[in-house]
Amino acid sequence: LGVDRFTRLFRARTGLAPERIMISATHTHSGPVTSSILSWRDDPTVPKADPEYMAAFKAGIIEAGVEAVSTAQPAAVAVTTAHSEGVGGNRLAADGTHDHEVGVMVVRRRADRQPLALQMVYSMHPTVLHEDSRLVSSDFPHYTREVLTAAMPGLQVLYHNGPSGNLSPRYHVKGQTFAEAERLGALLGRQVLEAVRRLGDADFREDLTVDGATCRAELPPRRFGSVAAAEAELREAKETYERLKREGAPHGPVRTAECTVFGAEERVVLAQAEQAGETAAILAEYNPIELQALRIGSTILACWPGECFVEYALQFKQAVPGAFVV
């Protein structure tokens, strides 16, 4: 999408400093393609991004931000956390590491103390619906927003994904349906709402310092090995997947094995591209990466690009108490 370009355009329209502008990506497996990914190039099920949609999408990012700045009003902020249980977990193992904490920031108008906005950070792939869904959906976060806005009419909900590269609802779902997305999303909404209702007037602050900072970091590139090794890995993954299906294994292990096949297929493409010398130019476009931190009072929003595993976020939050990772 060109985050640097958006930041320049947004600064020109609003005057905000670049380090105070965060563009947070949502995540769904039930929406239009918005990027070109090397590992998908041979996948017949993944279409190219639609230029007309992308033009509207990019314009919408700018206009949404400009509207937020232009309608700013005096407010007070409270920060809390909710404990989430039953929405999802580690996607590789039912008892694997995951993060139960939901970071919650509530903004209310000073004039009448009515809720204005709620920002939440939750580490979980919103993938109740799978890639075979033909309807555009934000998956279970939609139903989380519904619960919150029904309880607080007029509320604007900002839903941020935390690091969830190895997290999903797969061991908690009963099916890949909208009803199931509603069940999990509403559960999360009620858990957040419970935390919000525990807040009192003393928890809201008006005298908060707001600041931001950015830096660049060089990431070591992953090497994909030989094409032969990647193809062997793919064969093994397919054999495991087919065996689990034959044995009638539960949904969680079968879906994990299926996603392992997807990953192995992509590794073959990437190994071929690396062998052909195609990956260096692409890596140069994305490296170094930009890291960002936003401070609102004593709360830090650490903003990381990509789809990090949850262990990185847990380690960071242990080192920086009170921080949330987006």
Placement of each model-derived feature along the sequence:
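Non-catalytic substrate/cofactor recognition surfaces at enzyme active-site rims
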Residues: L1-V326
